[in-house]
Design a protein with these regions (language model features):
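Single conserved hydrophobic/aromatic residue that forms the stacking wall/gate
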Residues: 1-11
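Short Fe-S-cluster ligation motifs
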Residues: 46-74, 100-125
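Non-heme iron-sulfur electron-transfer modules
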Residues: 28-48, 52, 79, 90-101, ...
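Local cysteine-cluster metal-coordination motifs and their immediate loop/turn environment
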Residues: 12-42, 69-89, 107-121
Length: 130
């Protein structure tokens, strides 16, 4: 699967655990987040699949990407695509989540670098712009 993604220039979604535990591979399928490492292409045939590359509009970053950048919601960047995609899905379903709701929603996305404080702050910032 990695070679196919690289050929299609969709290389920012990550495979971390390959067992659907870390969340680095999250993409949107028909607008809902899905851990792609354990999903078969046949399962999403005919669906709209969006990777982090698909969030930008006319070369401009999505508000969630801007917030992660502005508020340092990333360090090494490995988990960032999945974290951003999950956070966007959250805000599509809940426009003003509490800190607890954000943390609960993102519990399937593991980050070993940030301690999550800046990630939660970034999600709250993006909520004001989405």
């Amino acid at each position: 699967p990695v070679n196919r993604r690289q050929r299609q220039m969709c290389i920012r979604d990550s495979i971390g655990c390959d067992t659907s535990q870390c969340g680095a591979c999250v993409v949107h399928v028909d607008g809902n987040s899905l851990k792609s490492c354990t999903a078969l292409a046949a399962d999403v045939n005919g669906s709209k699949v969006t990777t982090i590359e698909g969030l930008e509009t006319n070369g401009k970053m999505h508000p969630m990407q801007e917030a992660f950048k502005k508020l340092h919601g990333l360090q090494c960047g490995f988990c960032t695509p999945g974290m951003v995609m999950s956070a966007v899905d959250l805000l599509q379903k809940n426009k003003k989540p509490s800190d607890t709701e954000i943390r609960d929603w993102l519990e399937g996305n593991i980050c070993r670098c940030t301690g999550y404080q800046n990630i939660v702050a970034a999600v709250k910032e993006a909520a004001t712009k989405m």
